Amino acid sequence: MAGHSKWANTKHRKERADHKKGKIFSRTIKELISAVKMGGPDPKSNARLRMIIQKAKDQNIPNENIERNLKKASSADQKNYEEVTYELYGFGGVGIIVEAMTDNKNRTASDMRVAVNKRGGALVEPGSVLYNFSRKGACYVPKHSIDEASLLTHVIDCGGEDLDSDDEEFFLVLCEPTDLASVKEALLAKGVTCSEERLIYVPLRLVDCDEETGKSNLALIEWLENIDDVDDVYHNMA
């Protein structure tokens, strides 16, 4: 899939699987807290909360963790989480998009500035990088659950646009953002397991880098990924 590069495929395939899963779990818990803050703690009357609780269970987040965070979310001391997006240029004209979910935007902004100070690159105005990317829906299908050829047939039948097989653990079924819910439902109806569904950024064009530039960009990207509030980092490095 566009957005995965030779640098990502050699370096990021060696990423800590536990770290990646931890980020997914953390994001889901933040979404749960946000849903409670917006619509109340009762899943019977809060459709978004009901959906996120099911999502957490699908990700094998323990029930005690879910219950503990439901209580935490109901506390007046617990701040709500906000989604924030940062745009950067790395080395060699590579564009980087950072998505974070935070209860303290000042802290997250400070962490972003530290990343740039330590690893280079530049934070830029909103829209400066986004035009190089397209917003897509993505359903995450565990690779152990189905072979690529079979899934590709289902993707076409279910209204998906493309299939990304670059990730070590998941196939990504790509579609238009507005079609994400219907594509997921169609996949589930065919017996396909969808561990998660969400919106992602896919680059419209890739930027070639030499080895030194690629390593510098990876160092910046890895620093950004390790910021606690950061959920996803996208880039257009070839």
UniProtKB/Swiss-Prot annotation:
The organism's place on the tree of life at top rank: Bacteria
Annotated spans, Disordered: 1-21
Basic residues: bias regions: 9-21
Record GO biological process: regulation of DNA-templated transcription
InterPro entries given in the database record: Integrase-like_N, TACO1_YebC-like_2nd/3rd_dom, TACO1_YebC_N, Transcrip_reg_TACO1-like, Transcrip_reg_TACO1-like_dom3, YebC-like
HAMAP family, per database record: Transcrip_reg_TACO1 (MF_00693)
Family classification: Belongs to the TACO1 family.
Name of this chain's protein: Probable transcriptional regulatory protein CTL0717
Species name: Chlamydia trachomatis serovar L2 (strain ATCC VR-902B / DSM 19102 / 434/Bu)
Lineage, uppermost ranks: Bacteria, Pseudomonadati, Chlamydiota, Chlamydiia, Chlamydiales
